[in-house]
Amino acid sequence: MRDISLRPAGTRGADTAATTLPRRPRRDEPFTPASDARPLLLGHGGRLTVERLGTVAYGPAWELQDELAEQRRGRRIGDRLLLVEHFPVYTIGRGGDERNLLASPARLREIGAEFVRVDRGGDITFHGPGQLVAYPIVELRDPLDLRRYVRSLESAIIDTAAAFGVEAGREEGLTGVWVAGERKLAAIGVRVRRGVTTHGLALNVNTDLRWYAEMIPCGIRDREVTSLARELGHAVAMELVEERLSGALAAAFGLILAPIPTGLPGPAGASEQ
């Protein structure tokens, strides 16, 4: 497995600030979904193993996704969930319009951000400190049912936001999760190749929303972007959001959550099924 340089999550961004937090769920406490979505039920009755990678550049995380996805297709590993924060980067999907990136190359260098073209669906989005990015590497029972998979991701985000007192939902005709139908809380962009998913979701937790001034988020001009911190009026502990989102995704997929310690992934090719 590739060696990737990591920094502890939370070393950048507002999540280190003092905050009023919801009750921390017990490790053995079952997750109860707040949304009305039924589990995706991936069909193999396996576990969802969580890997917290900390803060990492986009490129190495993308390479790691591809490597793990190939191992998953070969049944050498079970389903994985990568949780990361990225250094500032704007990414654009296969069908995206590069005119939605407003910053020039010189401006990107000035603000210290990358621009990367990727193989997911969707348009342009931002990743950076204070944002929780989740990359499920899972085998779908029905690879053609991409819409249901995306709705499962949306349900998990809605449930997670509810756990912190933020009421969020879907907006007809648009992907992602929204607050009051006007403010985008989370973006989704995925790829399914030979039945296994890559890419995933980006949930604004304590994100500095000024980064979004350099782009037209997802190509949508008439909506705002928000974060849990903005909606609540205070910063939120990233670790708690990671725990709730992991449980929500496992519930949405119909899998058993099996977290592993923070840090580098385990040995490549190790069996987890």
Across the structure, where does each feature detected by a protein language model lie?
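N-terminal lobe of the biotin/lipoate ligase/transferase fold
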Residues: M1-L185, R210, A235-V236, G266-Q273
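Short, conserved beta-strand/beta-arch hydrophobic-aromatic motifs that form part
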Residues: E98-S104, L185-V205
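A structural signal for short, well-ordered beta-strand segments
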Residues: A134-P136, T175, I188-V190, L201-V205, ...
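Generic non-transmembrane alpha-helical segments
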Residues: A156-F164, R244-L255
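Flexible, glycine/charged-enriched surface loops at secondary-structure junctions
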Residues: E167-G169, G254-G263
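A hydrophobic, small-residue-rich beta->alpha segment in the mid-to-C-terminal subdomain
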Residues: N206-A250
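Cytochrome P450 proximal C-terminal region
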Residues: E239-L245, L249-F253, L264-Q273
